[in-house]
UniProtKB/Swiss-Prot annotation:
Motif D1 per UniProt: ranges: 139
Protein's name according to its UniProt entry: Ceramide glucosyltransferase 2
GO molecular function per UniProt: ceramide glucosyltransferase activity
Pathway: Lipid metabolism; sphingolipid metabolism
Keyword DNA damage: no
Intracellular or extracellular location(s): Membrane
Expression sites (tissue/organ): Expressed mostly in intestine and vulva.
GO biological process: glucosylceramide biosynthetic process
Gene name of this polypeptide: cgt-2
UniProt xrefs under Pfam families: Glyco_transf_21 (PF13506)
Organism: Caenorhabditis elegans
Length: 443
């Protein structure tokens, strides 16, 4: 070793033979640690094999069952709390809000069409236009709209016929001419069967402008009070099972919009390619939300539910509609195929009762009874919040139809799974995985 003395400092300069190359140091480290780790590898493999041999798959299933059903309970609580927080809040008029272009795609007429459409002519909003879209000029609904235009001449309204063929989604094709000439910053899509409260457009616009990045506002689907078994059945479905998921999903910022009554910022939608960009999808509402979210925009819900008020509800039409939605979800999100049939009351009751019985030897019948009581109580509370007034039917009728709907739900899923083709209006659609329309056949 050579010493170099500079003033009071002594620097030790190692000889060349003492300086080891970096690669040599790595080799030494490897030779040091490899034997240390290599002796544990057989032990690790042996331990893993023993765990796999000794694992109790029933215990794993039971633990998964408790976690899964607990998540469903959590959604119940979140949906109810968010409904109490968000629904039926008063909205003050605000003349600084931007104008709204309301697009109404219409096919056919029923006994409630005039009443439903009139609520848009009389809406309490300072600046809006009504854009009615018809596939054919001889549609029976044309005369209904013409009579309302004559009754309310001061309302800015326009009718379009024939649509514009830009893709396989007939609703997008029908609305395209109206979208092209819409003159306001906010675009609202509203189905013909929606009954609108006088301040609902105001509320949706206020919600939209409450946050700079808000670009999509929807109304939670519900139903106006109507007579008839099928109408009550539909109302209970939308007031319980559907409302719970919709409210909880929006609270947790899941993408779950429905297009029956929705409002978007035209500028944000144009960034995504406008209506034309979604003409290849049948569930355009879902993909509106997905694309807007991918660009950093937020979505929210109005304080007023969307009041569906079709006069032509039958059990067959309702079943076909729900079945069509199940098929859409299966095509768009195939990962939920195994989860969807288990999320209703009675399938989840069997899961949690088996799980708790296996893990803690808790009586299965007791668990099922407590589960059903919790489920129906929470559903009833959610529906009361959606209704926001006295129910139009008795508690006994609610109980009987609720039970029937819950028993009916697995059968709807089975029907949807057996025939993935989707019949809508006068067309049959076949979807590819991901939700894109693969083919369309007229019937």
């Amino acid at each position: 070793m050579g010493d170099k003395i500079t003033g009071l400092e002594v620097e030790i300069i190692p000889e060349i033979s003492e300086v080891q190359p970096e690669s040599l140091q790595e080799q030494n480290a490897s030779s040091l640690y490899y034997p240390l780790f290599s002796q544990y590898i057989p032990l690790l493999l042996t331990g893993t094999k023993k765990i796999l041999e000794d694992i109790d798959y029933c215990t794993c299933f039971a633990v998964f069952g408790v976690v899964f059903v607990s998540a469903l309970y959590f959604l119940h609580i979140v949906g109810l709390c968010y409904g109490k927080y968000r629904l039926h809040r008063p909205t003050k008029p605000n003349p600084s809000l931007p104008g709204v272009s309301i697009i109404k795609p219409i096919i056919g007429a029923d006994a409630n069409l005039y009443t439903n459409l009139e609520t848009f002519f009389t809406t309490q909003y300072h600046k809006f236009e009504l854009l009615f879209c018809f596939d054919r000029s001889d549609d029976p609904a044309v005369k209904v709209v013409e009579s309302l235009v004559k009754k309310y001449p001061s309302v800015d309204s326009t009718m379009f016929f024939g649509g514009e063929k830009i893709g396989l989604n007939p609703k997008i094709n029908n609305m395209m001419p109206a979208y092209r000439i819409a003159k306001y910053q906010l675009i609202m899509i509203s189905d013909s069967g929606i009954f609108m409260k006088s301040d609902a457009v105001l509320d949706m616009a206020s919600t939209m402008m409450s946050h700079e990045t808000m670009a999509l506002v929807t109304q939670t689907p519900y139903c106006k009070d109507r007579k008839g078994f099928a109408s009550v059945f539909e109302q209970i479905y939308f007031g319980t099972s559907h409302a719970r998921i919709y409210l909880a999903g929006n609270c947790l910022q899941f993408n779950c919009p429905t297009g029956m009554s929705s409002m978007m910022k035209k500028e944000a939608l144009d960034e995504c390619g406008g209506f034309a960009a979604f003409s290849g999808y049948l569930a355009e509402d879902y993909f509106f939300g997905k694309k807007l979210a991918s660009r950093g925009y937020k979505s929210g819900i109005s304080t007023h539910p969307a009041l569906q008020n079709s006069a032509a509800v039958t059990m067959t039409s309702f079943t076909d509609r729900v079945c069509r939605w199940v098929k859409l979800r299966m095509a768009m999100m195939p990962q939920i195929i195994f989860v969807e049939p288990l999320q209703d009351c009675f399938p989840s009751a069997l899961i949690i009762s088996f799980s708790l019985n296996y893990i803690a030897n808790i009586d299965m019948l007791t668990t099922i009874m407590l589960h059903v009581v919790f489920w129906i109580t929470m559903d009833c509370m959610v529906m009361c919040k959606m209704q926001n007034k006295k129910m139009s039917f008795s508690p006994l009728k609610f109980l009987l139809i609720w039970l029937l709907r819950e028993l009916f739900a697995p059968l709807v899923f089975i029907k949807a799974a057996l025939d993935p083709s989707i019949r809508w209006r006068d067309n049959v659609f076949h979807l590819a995985w991901g939700g894109k329309i693969r083919s369309q056949t007229s019937i």
